[in-house]
């Protein structure tokens, strides 16, 4: 059941990302063609748009294939980073007392064999009316919360918890340790 939840979450994440990329692409194209009435200028802009994207694709493939580029863009086979931890937060049904409730999902999006531990989240003065399992998420100090009791989160693994407060806390990944 847990793996099924992870796969559904990964599919959901993929389709949202795809939708965002598609909408950005369409808005860029629409802005390029705006104000152009003549067919020749539209054709030239369309050709330049396509060639820019072809160059980006070629560059991306080159970065993936060349292991000697040391600028950090080639991440295949290298250590993980805090960017591999994706944190989602959304509102859920309020408590019977009317206090707003929120669900947080923390996901290791690393595609290679990387276990990420000691995940620290910037969380302000995080507190909750609803009890949050301290092994899953707990505040250590101001703006420092620990995820999964410091234990590793494997590639593709996620965990979630719910909290209740009069407002949602802005949560972001502060630091991680890679294994």
Swiss-Prot record:
Give start-end of the signal peptide: 1-30
Pfam family of the protein (one): TPD1_C
**UniProt xrefs under InterPro entries:** TPD1 (IPR040361)
Q: Which UniProt keywords apply?
A: Signal
Picking any one GO biological process from the record gives:
response to heat
Q: Which domain of life is it from?
A: Eukaryota
Give all cystine bridges in this chain.
none
Q: What is this protein called?
A: TPD1 protein homolog 1
Which organism does this sequence originate in? Arabidopsis thaliana (Mouse-ear cress)
Lineage of the native species? Eukaryota, Viridiplantae, Streptophyta, Embryophyta, Tracheophyta
């Amino acid at each position: 059941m847990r793996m099924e939840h992870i796969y559904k979450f990964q599919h959901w994440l993929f389709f949202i990302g795809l939708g965002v990329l598609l909408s950005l692409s369409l808005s860029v194209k629409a802005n390029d063609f705006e104000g152009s009435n003549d067919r020749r200028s539209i054709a030239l802009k369309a050709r330049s748009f396509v060639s820019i994207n072809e160059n980006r694709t070629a560059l991306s493939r080159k970065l993936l294939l060349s292991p000697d580029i040391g600028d950090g863009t080639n991440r295949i086979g290298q250590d993980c980073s805090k960017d591999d931890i994706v944190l989602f937060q959304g509102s859920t049904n309020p408590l019977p007392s009317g206090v707003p409730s929120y669900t947080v999902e923390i996901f290791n999006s690393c595609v290679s064999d990387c276990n990420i531990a000691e995940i620290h989240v910037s969380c302000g003065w995080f507190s909750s009316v609803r009890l949050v399992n301290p092994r899953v998420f707990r505040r250590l100090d101001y703006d420092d919360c620990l995820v999964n009791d410091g234990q590793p989160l494997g590639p593709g693994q996620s965990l979630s918890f719910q909290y209740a407060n009069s407002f949602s806390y802005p949560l972001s990944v502060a630091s991680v340790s890679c294994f």
